[in-house]
Amino acid sequence: MAMMRLSTSASDGKANLHQGAVGVGICIATGKAVRAVQFDQPVTHHPDTGKELAALQVPHWEKLLTLASSAWEMTGLGYMGTDMVLDQEEGPMVLELNARPGLAIQIANGAGLLPRLHHIENLGTPAEYPKAAERVAYAAKQFGVHGSEIVSS
């Protein structure tokens, strides 16, 4: 699952959801917005700018996902949250890895995480683990969102 956090005047310029930032669920296959929430309630436009959130498309999406997926080799954690930024000069960068990430990502995506975790667990332990790019391709195919679920005004 993926989520983008957008700061607002209500969140005092911080990207903290509990302070009023907007959480935008992102399709794992495309990097496009699927749903957005503020204070756990659906929103279609940014409260300050008025921009339609359904129009959001994360640049360098595949690079971001591959970098996040490669964190598994570094940590061995089966489930983790990866906080990332897009630097103008350096591109995708990892800010931090969280062994116990928040669950607000489920609200922003309008979907539960448990079925995805069960799906992955049911795959079993392979003789050889797939590379990061292969894991990204698998997740995109299995967990991508269909067009009918995308936010609109």
Cite the ranges covered by each PLM segment.
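A short acidic/small-residue loop/turn micro-motif
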Residues: S7, Q41, R100-G102
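A long amphipathic alpha-helix within ATP-dependent nucleotide-binding catalytic cores
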Residues: A10-D87
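C-terminal active-site "lid" helix and adjoining low-complexity regulatory extension at the edge
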Residues: H45-K63, E73, L77, L86-S153
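Beta-strand scaffold of nucleotide-dependent catalytic cores
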Residues: M1-R5, G13-N16, V94-L97
